[in-house]
C-alpha cells in the first residue's frame, strides 16, 4: 500500500540495466522521480489501485521475447542463419518500438493504420492475427494477471 510521502513503491524492470524503459512509482514523489529519471522513464502513478494496471502489463515481457524468438526461428527454418535472423527481428522491433515512443503522444491506432496498405502484407498479418483471436488473448492474459495482482 502506498503511504503518501513515506513509502514510495517503484518497480524498475530488467531493461533498466541498459538505462531503458519505464519505472512506475507510486505515489508521485519529486525526489524519487529525479533519481529514476537518470536510469529510465519514470511514470508517476496516483495510487496503488491504479498501479496494478501497470504491474499487469509488465507480466508480458516474456511473451514479447517469445514472439521475437518464434519469428526468428521461423526465419531459421526458411534457411536464414540464426545470427542474421535474430539480428533482423530484434532490429526491426527495436525500430518499431522507437517509432512508437517518438509518436507516443498520438493514439497508437495511428501507427496501426499508417503501417499497412490495403491488401498489403501488414494488412494481411493484422487481419489474420485478429481473426485468430491473438489480440483478445492478450487482453484475456492481462486480465488474468491483473486478477492475480488484485487478490
Feature annotation, model-predicted:
Residues 5-6, 21-55, 59-105, 144-149:
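Internal alpha-helical scaffold of NAD(P)-dependent oxidoreductase catalytic cores
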Residues 16-17:
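Conserved catalytic-site region of short-chain dehydrogenase/reductase
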Residues 1-3:
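Short, small-residue-biased leader/transition segments that mark boundaries at the very start
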Residues 30, 90, 94-151:
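NAD(P)-dependent Rossmann-like dehydrogenase/reductase catalytic/cofactor-binding core
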Amino acid at each position: 500500500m502506498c503511504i503518501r510521502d513515506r513509502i514510495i513503491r517503484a518497480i524498475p524492470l530488467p531493461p533498466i540495466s541498459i538505462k531503458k524503459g519505464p519505472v512506475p512509482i507510486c505515489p508521485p514523489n519529486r525526489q524519487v522521480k529525479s533519481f529514476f529519471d537518470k536510469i529510465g522513464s519514470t511514470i508517476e502513478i496516483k495510487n496503488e489501485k491504479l498501479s496494478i494496471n501497470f504491474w499487469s502489463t509488465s507480466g508480458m515481457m516474456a511473451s514479447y521475447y517469445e514472439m521475437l524468438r518464434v519469428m526468428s526461428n521461423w526465419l531459421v527454418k526458411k534457411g536464414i542463419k540464426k545470427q542474421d535472423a535474430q539480428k533482423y527481428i530484434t532490429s526491426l522491433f527495436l525500430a518499431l518500438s522507437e517509432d512508437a515512443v517518438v509518436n507516443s503522444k498520438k493514439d497508437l491506432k495511428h501507427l496501426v493504420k499508417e503501417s499497412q496498405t490495403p491488401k498489403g502484407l501488414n494488412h494481411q498479418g493484422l487481419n489474420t492475427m485478429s481473426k485468430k483471436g491473438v489480440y483478445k488473448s492478450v487482453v484475456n492474459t492481462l486480465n488474468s494477471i491483473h486478477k492475480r495482482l488484485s487478490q
